[in-house]
Amino acid sequence: MKISIIGGSGFVGSNLSKLFKKNNINFQIFDNVKSKFFPEKYIHGDIRHNDELKEIADSDVLINLAAVHRDDVRPLSLYDEINVEGSKNICKLARENGINKIIFTSSVAVYGFAKPNTNENGEINYFNDYGRTKYLAEGVFIEWYNEDPVNRTLVIIRPTVIFGKGNRGNVYNLLNQINSKKFAMFGNGKNIKSMAYVKNVAAFINHSLSFEKGLHLYNYIDKPDMNMNQLVSITRGVLFNKPNVGLRMPAFIGKLIGYVADIISFIIKKNLPISSIRVKKFLSTTQFDSSLEIANFKAPYSLEDGLQKTLKYEFIEDNKNKVTFETE
C-alpha cells in the first residue's frame, strides 16, 4: 500500500510522516514546500495543477492536509483556489486512477462560534473564508464518495486547535507570553478550551487507515478539556515550578487593555502581542465534543502529557536548530 500525504511538509504532515516511518508504512509527500524531515520522500507539486498531481497517480490512499488557513492570506481568492478547487483536482486524480480511499483534514472552523459541546451534528455556521472553504471542500469529497459508495472510503476529520513542538500558532503564542513573565490572567479562568496534541492527531489519521468502506466524519479533540485556570497552572508549574495562575485581573480590564493595544497598533502600524481579538478569544469558551470512542481510538498521549512535552521542548531544553511551522 502506497500513501501520499498531500501537504505533508507542514506541521501535521511532518508528525504523521515520522509516525509512518516508525511504523514502516510506505509513504510519499506531495507539497509545494520541500520537506525538512523527509527530503527523500518529497515530490514537488501544487494541488492547483492537475499535471503535477499526476506524479502521485500510483497511490492507494490520499491524505489531504493541504490548505490555506492564515488570517492574512492575500489575495483572498487563494482560499477557494487551494481549499476548494484543489480538492476538486484531488478527487479528479482519485477518480481517474482508481484510488478509493481519501482522508481529509477539515476543521471545527466550519461550526464558527459554536455552542459548548458541539459535536459532529452541530450547526454549520462558519464566519470566515477558512471555515467556508473547508466546508465546501468537504462537499467536494462527499460528492466523490457518493459516486461509488460501495467501493470508496472517505474519512473527514475536523480537528480543533492543534499544538505541539515547533508549531507557532495561538497556543504557542499563549505559552510564550506566560514564559516571558509578561502574562496576566483575565477573568475567572473557568472558560474551556478544546485542544488537540499533534501526535494524537497523527495517530488518529494513522488509525483511520483501517476504516472500512463508507463515509466517516469525526471531530478531533483531546479529552478531557482544560479550562484556562488548568492550562495556565500547568504551564507555570512546568516553567517556574509555580502551579498557579499568578496575577489575575477582572475581565473588563483585559478588554480595555486589548482596545488600547488596538489603537497603539493602528498608530505605529505594527502588530502587538495583545489585541482586543486575542483577549476576546482568551476569555471565550471554545469547547467541542466528538464521537471518537465509536472509532475505537485511544490517544497515545494525554492532553497534559502533550502540553508538558511541548513546554519542555520549546522553553527548557536546548533546541537551537529546531524546525518551526508558522500558523495563525
Task: State what each model feature region is.
Residues 47-85, 93, 111:
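NAD(P)H-binding glycine-rich loop region in Rossmannoid oxidoreductase-like domains
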Residues 3-22:
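N-terminal Rossmann NAD(P)H-binding glycine-rich loop of SDR-like oxidoreductase domains
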Residues 111, 155-172:
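Flexible, glycine-rich beta-alpha linker
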Residues 89-129:
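Conserved Rossmann-fold NAD(P)-dependent oxidoreductase catalytic core, especially the SDR/UDP-sugar
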Residues 167-173, 187-209, 216:
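Substrate-positioning beta->alpha
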Residues 81, 115-162, 183-186:
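Catalytic helix-loop patch of NAD(P)-dependent Rossmann-fold dehydrogenases
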Residues 48, 78-89, 124, 132-133, ...:
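Glycine-rich NAD(P)-binding loop of the Rossmann-fold in SDR/ketoreductase-type enzymes
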Residues 208-273, 301-311, 318-328:
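Mid/C-terminal beta-alpha module of Rossmann-like enzyme folds, strongest
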